[in-house]
């Protein structure tokens, strides 16, 4: 992802987020080791994408054939357990306290994922057509 983003000037600003989103919140785990997410000016964005990526990967029942999808509530408990070490504690607190966000994320991760993926795909196809 980082290499792709660096090849397109319109997306270059997102490169640090793509590069650092596999690092833990406290910076002790993940990759690449050479990237210090704790000192990045994009830390909040990195932390948000880290949570989103983990949530997506853990609940994905379509394309992750190397594991079974977990229910949203199980993943939410894992986020809670990793609060402050693996995950940004403030962001986890929002996930735990905002009922509307909880309901939206539960629906997005457990229902209708196929249509969501297709809509995102069409958005990118149309964006690319406009740029040509």
Feature-to-residue mapping (PLM):
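Histidine- and acidic-residue-rich, metal-dependent catalytic cores
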Residues: 1-132
């Amino acid at each position: 992802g980082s290499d792709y983003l660096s090849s397109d000037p319109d997306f270059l600003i997102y490169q640090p987020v793509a590069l650092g989103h596999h690092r833990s919140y406290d910076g002790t785990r993940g990759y690449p080791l050479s990237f210090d997410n704790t000192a990045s000016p994009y830390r909040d964005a990195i932390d948000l994408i880290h949570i989103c990526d983990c949530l997506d990967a853990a609940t994905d029942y379509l394309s992750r054939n190397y594991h079974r999808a977990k229910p949203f509530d199980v993943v939410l408990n894992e986020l809670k357990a990793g609060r402050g070490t693996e995950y940004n504690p403030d962001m986890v607190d929002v996930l735990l306290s905002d009922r509307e966000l909880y309901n939206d994320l539960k629906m997005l991760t457990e229902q209708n994922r196929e249509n969501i993926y297709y809509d995102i795909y069409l958005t990118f196809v149309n964006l690319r057509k406009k740029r040509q």
